[in-house]
């Protein structure tokens, strides 16, 4: 597994690199924190571990840049005790979030879970669903409508799959939150709202933002 570890604390970087390599992970770091994307594109990581507080530009900036060109899983690290960091990471399409200090074995377990979810599942037979006049590719986390294609984060795709497998039915927020927790994603009532709003924003790019309806006090419904 190729891991890009974007961490400016060299002591922590070396400790994590040593631990991860004991699990046969191939770990690369950053030499110039103004050129993170250069390393990202040349190393082609399978998972990115991204610190929030970085020199020159913060982790949120680099997450945006990565999401412009890739749907690679991103796990944020943060030493700040600020719930908005977690919300922001969700809005930007991160797959997980850990607050420092943390147990290394928990980090490794999260990385393994992300890898299984993203790469082992997508290696299976292609799974698609038809929704309105679009094709939802569950293996690629994408939606194609005509000549246009959008890409979703893992959390967004889980939400969408739940809704479109129960088309024209109200799915409660609690049902979705439970499914996300079972999938080891990080989620709360507020971050669910953030994810649904971000999902709608992406759907608007293919003129499908009204395809998911909010049922106030009840949940959400995907229309046929």
UniProtKB/Swiss-Prot annotation:
Phenotype upon loss of function: Deletion leads to complete loss of resistance towards host cationic antimicrobial peptides (CAPs).
Single GO MF annotation: phosphorelay response regulator activity
Subcellular location: Cytoplasm
Cross-referenced InterPro entries: CheY-like_superfamily (IPR011006), OmpR/PhoB-type_DNA-bd (IPR001867), Sig_transdc_resp-reg_C-effctor (IPR016032), Sig_transdc_resp-reg_receiver (IPR001789), WalR-like (IPR039420), WH-like_DNA-bd_sf (IPR036388)
Assembly mode: Interacts with GraX.
Record's keyword terms, sorted: Activator, Antibiotic resistance, Cytoplasm, DNA-binding, Phosphoprotein, Repressor, Transcription, Transcription regulation, Two-component regulatory system, Virulence
Biological source species: Staphylococcus aureus (strain MW2)
DNA-binding region: 126-224
Stretches assigned to the Response regulatory domain: 2-115
Coiled coil location: none
GO annotation, biological process: regulation of DNA-templated transcription; response to antibiotic
Modification after translation: Phosphorylated by GraS. Phosphorylated by Stk1; phosphorylation increases the DNA-binding activity of GraR.
PANTHER family, alphabetized: REGULATOR OF RPOS, SENSORY TRANSDUCTION PROTEIN BCER
SUPFAM superfamilies on file: C-terminal effector domain of the bipartite response regulators, CheY-like
Modification sites for Phosphothreonine: 128, 130, 149
Record has Cytoplasm as a keyword: yes
Record's keyword annotation contains Repressor: yes
4-aspartylphosphate modification, residue list: 51
Protein name: Response regulator protein GraR
Task performed by this protein: Member of the two-component regulatory system GraR/GraS involved in resistance against cationic antimicrobial peptides (CAMPs). Upon phosphorylation by GraS, functions as a transcription regulator by direct binding to promoter regions of target genes such as adhesins, exoproteins, transporters, toxins, and proteins involved in cell wall synthesis. Down-regulates the expression of many genes involved in RNA and amino acid synthesis or glycolysis.
Gene3D superfamilies attached to this UniProt entry: 3.40.50.2300, Winged helix-like DNA-binding domain superfamily/Winged helix DNA-binding domain (1.10.10.10)
Highest taxon above the source species: Bacteria
CC terms in the record's Gene Ontology section: cytosol; protein-DNA complex
Main subcellular location of this protein, as a coarse class: cytoplasm
